[in-house]
């Protein structure tokens, strides 16, 4: 795998050409507040806080190439078929491994990634930057579109993120029944989903979590039309990679509409726009989990312009760089950069544990004493201030006879 990676700085940042051609590739994103995500080169993966609180449908490694359910952003150029800036359309997938496959590049660092795609056929370049601010439970997609032709082009844009909104247990246990608990509303900024109850092995519990997808232009302009359920968005006979709504231009519902009892969709349409030669525009998608509508509104106000998002991205990059404060200097610069990621692993272990990445899908989020002790050993070098409390808190949970020490 390393032969495909080109390291681009001294902090482990790298780029990969046509990353969608690499199987089982995904990237971790997380905050210190609890939100944990995995994101693939075509923006598959999932997002969650814990076993019982999944924003996006839970995935394991085999789901990475099986699932169509993924984060997406569609651009429709006037007079042409729709285009996915994530590469997740039926047409773009069919073009893969042929001379019609478009150029793409993934650039990534600690807790952020940027996907760049070039459509020669449609004459524009798009980028999607994904990250989670260190202190908030919101995943941010920052999308840019730049006209590369010599003529003015007209476009329409759609944000589209399926909202799972419940426990991982419900993937096969009461999947249909729990969708009937969904209470969905459209707001000025997007879609909120608040199931009436959680329904898992703990029993029937009243639910207060709100799963949401908000969107705006880089200038803070709201969507104009909304698609709050999967059926609304994909249409009769449609799929996530070939949604009838986008292909046939169906109009959605207005803000302040209600839906219930169906699989939820965080999808909306923006006002059409034109780009002069060389002109660029941008959009922001915010997806997350909150305890109140006020919290969602505060998050939106915090990240509703391109400048705010760029500042948050820079803060996120600086924060995680500072955490990995060990440098390596050998005769092989690539090895030195690779070792930065080895040093970053204990932080990922602390945040994700054994249960919340596609190849680490065992258990329900718990970590045994052996795991915690191994993490503490490496953190003694990287973050010694926190290790004493981690050891004391971990020992406090071990039974006197040691019978739960590795559970």
Walk through the language-model features, giving the residues of each.
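Anionic coordination/interaction segments
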Residues: 1-373, 381-400, 405
């Amino acid at each position: 795998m390393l032969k495909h990676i080109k390291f681009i700085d001294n902090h482990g940042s790298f780029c990969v050409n046509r990353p969608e051609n690499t199987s089982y590739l995904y990237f971790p994103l997380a905050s210190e507040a609890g939100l944990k995500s995995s994101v693939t080169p075509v923006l598959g993966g999932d997002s969650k806080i814990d076993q019982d609180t999944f924003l996006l449908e839970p995935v394991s490694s085999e789901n990475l190439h099986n699932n169509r359910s993924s984060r997406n952003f569609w651009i429709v150029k006037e007079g042409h078929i729709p285009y996915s800036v994530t590469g997740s359309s039926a047409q773009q997938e069919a073009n893969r491994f042929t001379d019609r496959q478009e150029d793409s590049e993934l650039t990534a660092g600690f807790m952020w990634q940027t996907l760049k795609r070039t459509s020669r056929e449609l004459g524009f370049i798009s980028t999607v930057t994904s990250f989670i601010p260190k202190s908030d439970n919101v995943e941010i997609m920052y999308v840019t579109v730049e006209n590369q032709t010599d003529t003015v082009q007209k476009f329409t844009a759609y944000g589209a993120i399926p909202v799972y909104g419940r426990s991982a247990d419900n993937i096969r246990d009461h999947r249909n029944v729990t969708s009937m608990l969904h209470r969905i509303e459209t707001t000025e900024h997007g879609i909120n989903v608040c199931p009436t109850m959680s329904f898992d092995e703990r029993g029937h519990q009243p639910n207060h979590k709100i799963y949401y997808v908000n969107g705006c232009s880089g200038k803070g302009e709201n969507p104009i039309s909304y698609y709050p359920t999967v059926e609304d968005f994909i249409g009769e006979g449609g799929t996530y990679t070939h949604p009838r709504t986008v292909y046939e231009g169906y109009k959605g519902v207005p803000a302040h509409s209600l839906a219930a009892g169906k699989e939820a969709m965080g999808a909306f349409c923006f006002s059409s726009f034109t780009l002069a030669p060389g002109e660029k525009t941008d959009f922001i998608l915010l997806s997350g989990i909150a305890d109140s509508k006020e919290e969602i509104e505060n998050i939106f106000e915090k990240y509703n312009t391109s400048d705010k998002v760029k500042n948050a991205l820079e803060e996120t990059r600086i924060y995680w760089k500072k955490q990995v404060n060990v440098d390596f200097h050998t005769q092989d610069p690539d090895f030195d950069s690779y070792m930065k990621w080895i040093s970053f692993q204990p932080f990922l272990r602390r945040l994700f544990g054994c249960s919340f990445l596609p190849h680490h899908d065992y258990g329900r989020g718990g970590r045994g004493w052996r795991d915690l002790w191994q993490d503490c050993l490496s953190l003694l070098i990287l973050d010694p201030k926190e290790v004493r409390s981690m050891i004391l808190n971990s020992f406090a949970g071990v039974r006197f006879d040691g019978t739960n020490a590795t559970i």
